A protein has these predicted regions:
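Hydrophobic membrane-targeting alpha-helices
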Residues: 12-17, 178-179
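Hydrophobic alpha-helical transmembrane segments and their immediate juxtamembrane helical boundaries
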Residues: 165-181
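Short, low-complexity N-terminal intrinsically disordered segments enriched in polar/charged residues
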Residues: 17-41, 145
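Short, well-ordered alpha-helical segments enriched in acidic and aromatic residues
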Residues: 38-63
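Surface-exposed, charged secondary-structure patches
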Residues: 56-112
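Sec-dependent N-terminal signal peptides
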Residues: 4-14
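Short beta-strand edge/turn micro-motifs at domain boundaries
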Residues: 18-22, 102-165
């Protein structure tokens, strides 16, 4: 019995931790899921999310991947990944011809879609080229300026509040104190 107890206690030390979620761009569902999953706060890994974008340097692909998610969030578009096809040979048959593509929101945001290139699915070149304009339509010009001013360390959380929010609150309190002094 004592040996079993030692085995149970020591077994976790020898096991290798693995990512249960990996980058998968084999079908429309996997591509969109990979993109959104790796941009969530609890699983944030923008390098992996950027793998859903083809033909850009990693730094640019990361920025584009983040902006795609921000546009979807800013428009209030919830992506129901369970409705996205898992067929790697999915064809969009809307229109006169069929293409290997999947449009996330055909009526509300037809510019954002994934397409099959080779045997993998990526966000389309049209999506990538139009995302800057879509972002500008959704967010005012000063939002991007503020995002560039706040360093990555400003997004660390303390007691459930991001550091930049805490600093902003302290600045407001200080201003309020001096105004009403």
């Amino acid at each position: 019995m004592k040996n079993y107890l030692w085995c149970l206690l020591l077994l976790p030390m020898f096991s290798i931790a693995q990512d249960s979620i990996r980058v998968d761009i084999s079908n429309p569902h996997a591509t969109v899921y990979t993109h959104l999953y790796f941009l969530q706060s609890d699983s944030f890994d923008p390098q992996k999310a950027a793998k859903t974008i083809l033909g850009l340097p990693e730094e640019q692909a990361i920025k584009k991947a983040i902006k795609i998610k921000q546009v979807l969030d800013g428009k209030g578009l919830y992506v129901d990944v369970n409705k996205i096809p898992v067929n790697p040979n999915h064809k969009d048959t809307i229109g006169y011809s069929s293409y290997f593509k999947y449009v996330l929101f055909p009526q509300r945001m037809p510019q954002i879609y994934v397409e099959k290139i080779g045997d993998k699915w990526y966000y389309s070149s049209e999506t990538i080229s139009k995302i800057e304009n879509l972002y500008k339509e959704v967010y005012p010009w000063y939002v991007q300026k503020l995002e560039n001013l706040i360093p990555v360390s400003g997004h660390k959380k303390i007691l459930g509040i991001e550091l930049w929010q805490f600093i902003g609150f302290l600045i407001l309190l200080t201003l309020g104190y001096f105004i009403f002094l």
